[in-house]
Amino acid sequence: MKKQPKMTAIALILSGISGLAYGHGYVSAVENGVAEGRVTLCKFAANGTGEKNTHCGAIQYEPQSVEGPDGFPVTGPRDGKIASAESALAAALDEQTADRWVKRPIQAGPQTFEWTFTANHVTKDWKYYITKPNWNPNQPLSRDAFDLNPFCVVEGNMVQPPKRVNHECIVPEREGYQVILAVWDVGDTAASFYNVIDVKFDGNGPVLPDWNPAGQIIPSMDLSIGDTVYTRVFDNEGENPAYRTELKIDSETLTKANQWSYALATKINQTQKQQRAGQLNGDQFVPVYGTNPIYLKEGSGLKSVEIGYQIEAPQPEYSLTVSGLAKEYEIGEQPIQLDLTLEAQGEMSAELTVYNHHQKPLASWSQAMTDGELKSVTLELSEAKAGHHMLVSRIKDRDGNLQDQQTLDFMLVEPQTPPTPGDYDFVFPNGLKEYVAGTKVLASDGAIYQCKPWPYSGYCQQWTSNATQYQPGTGSHWEMAWDKH
């Protein structure tokens, strides 16, 4: 009896600070969205089918961070760098072929596009562009590939949107594989966020109505000679081993992820009557050296397919605990120092880098760590300017392969002179019902905030212990109600 292997467990535990996220947003399909963005599918599985993009690089850990110069199409990212917005973190997104990325079904006409924000910046607008009917999907994305007249424009009115928004747009007529470019132009920086969305126009219904998508073969990792990859096919009663397809890795060629994905899809098509694998091409299922969707025959009684592995040499587990980071540091005469403690599980290389909001590195540290090792690390920042900063932690194995990456946010703040009672009207939330435009309150962060003029002044009174979004300085939407003094 074959056992389900224990796959690599990668954990990065960051303690001592809540994970406040300052950047920024991505195209999603959690509630109403018609399709997820390319970068979204690097981290999250597609709604309904479970498909994912692979080999995305470091951006898979930060899908909200595809940020680049604004002004598209006059300025903005260079041709060939549109998908990544010229961000080194997202460079893998610029790869472009007809079969490189998961494609989400779409139809022309009214459609809903959804954004999820980790930081809901004041917004100028959102614009949506689509590739031309005759674009070449095997060339890097350029301005020439797109119709540069946006098919949908949504005004942001220079206010903060909620953490999830829906845009109703009319999608133009197209056929086959197309790319939609969604651009979020934030109003409080000189940057925009760029998300490309890979879609496939399938007319008014599925190309092959007798086949239903039920899973996919994701080439997520290389294997070793002696390993086995196989399908796990489920019906209403659970897993049915009679429909399993196994592929033994018996050559060096088959150890490569794209190779075994292609070989397994080919074997499914050769041996299974109720299953097919590969990219749809007309009325054919064509295996590819990449992600291969799996389909089940209508009426077969089969429900879904997953991929299992029998790993001869279990992969090691890694975890890193980073503690000691404060929420904010006050700027003084001496350089800012971050005093951190690291604890490793597994043999690894740990890397820490501090960036300011503009991605300028201010401090770095890296060192090999052994299993169970505790280490104290002090990072001294090369400069200290008030605002948002990030501590980026990376785990690499002994071969230099990135295993995980996380970003933790903190603030540098100017020293404040303690306010006197004459500087404010109330200590928040005392006197809540008396707050009007111009009212000044002392907030929990020690700063003074003034209630905005009408029509925003009504938000100043909207607070309870269970609804704190407008709480000055700390609420998710406090800037809609208050000005900081």
Swiss-Prot record:
Q: Which InterPro entries match?
A: Cellulose/chitin-bd_N, GbpA_2, GbpA_D3, GlcNAc-bd_A, GlcNAc_Chitin_IntDeg, Ig_E-set
Q: Does the keyword Membrane apply?
A: no
What sequence ranges are listed for the domain Chitin-binding type-3?
437-478
**Which keywords does this Swiss-Prot/TrEMBL entry list?**
Chitin-binding, Secreted, Signal
- Which Gene3D superfamilies does this one have? 2.60.40.2550, 3.30.70.2150, chitin-binding protein cbp21
List locations, semicolon-separated. Secreted
Q: Which part of the chain is the Chitin-binding type-4 domain?
A: 24-201
One GO molecular function term of this record is: chitin binding
- The organism sits in which domain of life? Bacteria
> What is a single cellular component term in the Gene Ontology annotation?
extracellular region
What is the protein's known function?
Probably interacts with GlcNAc residues. May promote attachment to both epithelial cell surfaces and chitin.
**HAMAP family hit by this protein:** GbpA (MF_01905)
Q: Which family does it belong to?
A: Belongs to the GbpA family.
* Name under which the protein is recorded: GlcNAc-binding protein A
